[in-house]
A protein has these predicted regions:
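Conserved glycine-rich cofactor-binding loop
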Residues: 9, 16-17
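Conserved glycine-rich Rossmann-like NAD(P)H-binding loop of the short-chain dehydrogenase/reductase
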Residues: 30-47
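The beta1-alpha1 cofactor-binding region of Rossmann-like NAD(H)/NADP(H)-dependent oxidoreductases
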Residues: 41-42, 63-73, 105
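Substrate-binding pocket helix/loop in short-chain dehydrogenase/reductase
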Residues: 99-100, 104-109
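Active-site helix of classical SDR
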Residues: 123, 159
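Residue(s) in the substrate-gating loop at a strand-loop-helix junction
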Residues: 143
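C-terminal helical subdomain
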Residues: 179, 183-187, 204-250
Length: 250
């Protein structure tokens, strides 16, 4: 039986774990050739080998999304190694929470560079390729934090609100070229993201939120939403998907 994405090429950033890894598995399982980008090359290589041994096509590319040159090379590698680029999933991200007052400025810089500039750089490299092909799909991973701001997450909110704004403006620019744009906004997902935080109040708040939700989302839940969006007919442009675990209030 033919896969829904047979003949398609997808590039996924932040592919070494969490939502990125789950998305690689979901898209490859539907028949797509996948380019895996992240800094942890050992994990990428192992995952790409697993996909290839299962009969799929995959290439692992060391990627630092904060470098425009690295982002451009990643997109070029997808083209040269796999034969094109149909889908880009901008998943790489970090979440470093805490109050504005006294915040380590390097953490703010990291979030802006990874969550915003990284997404911009990869998109900038991908759009001309997709425009030339007459079609494409860009999926940007935002968050519920891109819809509602809360104390203790000001700069993370800023980055994710920015993802939403950029995605809508991009949609207006490129939809006439056959390029679709989707923003995915997950709630609490069981990934490494929460473990980036060290501020005691933040760590406690995350743990309390986890306890307040009967069952948090899994990375595969988000990957399923991405697969849904990218397998719709070309006439269907799924622009926004908000996903919370049942019981999450905010």
């Amino acid at each position: 039986m033919a896969g829904l994405l047979d003949g398609k090429v997808a590039a996924i950033t932040g592919a070494s774990s969490g939502i990125g890894e789950a998305t690689v598995r979901a898209l490859a399982g539907a028949g797509a050739a996948v380019a895996l980008g992240a800094r942890r090359v050992d994990r990428l290589t192992a995952l790409a080998s697993e996909i290839s041994e299962g009969g799929g096509r995959a290439t692992a590319v060391e990627l630092d999304v904060t470098s425009s040159d690295s982002a451009s090379s990643f997109i070029s590698s997808a083209q040269s190694e796999l034969g094109g680029l149909d889908i880009l999933v901008n998943n790489a991200g970090v979440m470093l929470l805490g109050p504005v007052e006294g915040a380590p400025l390097d953490q703010w810089r990291t979030m802006v560079e990874v969550n915003v500039l990284g997404l911009l750089y990869c998109t900038h490299a991908a759009v001309p390729v997709m425009r030339s092909a007459g079609a494409g799909h860009i999926v940007n991973i935002s968050s519920v934090a891109g819809r509602s701001a809360n104390a203790g997450s000001a700069v993370y909110n800023l980055t994710k609100f920015g993802v939403g704004a950029f995605s809508e403006a991009l949609r207006q620019e490129v939809s006439s070229a056959g390029i679709r744009t989707t923003v995915i906004e997950p709630g609490f997902v069981d990934t490494e993201l929460q473990g980036h935080n060290e501020h005691p109040a933040v760590v406690e708040g995350i743990e309390q939120m986890r306890k307040s939700v009967p069952e948090v989302l899994q990375a595969s839940d988000i990957a399923s939403a991405i697969l849904y969006a990218v397998t719709q007919p070309q006439r269907v442009d799924v622009n926004e998907v908000l996903i919370r675990p049942t019981g999450q209030r905010r």
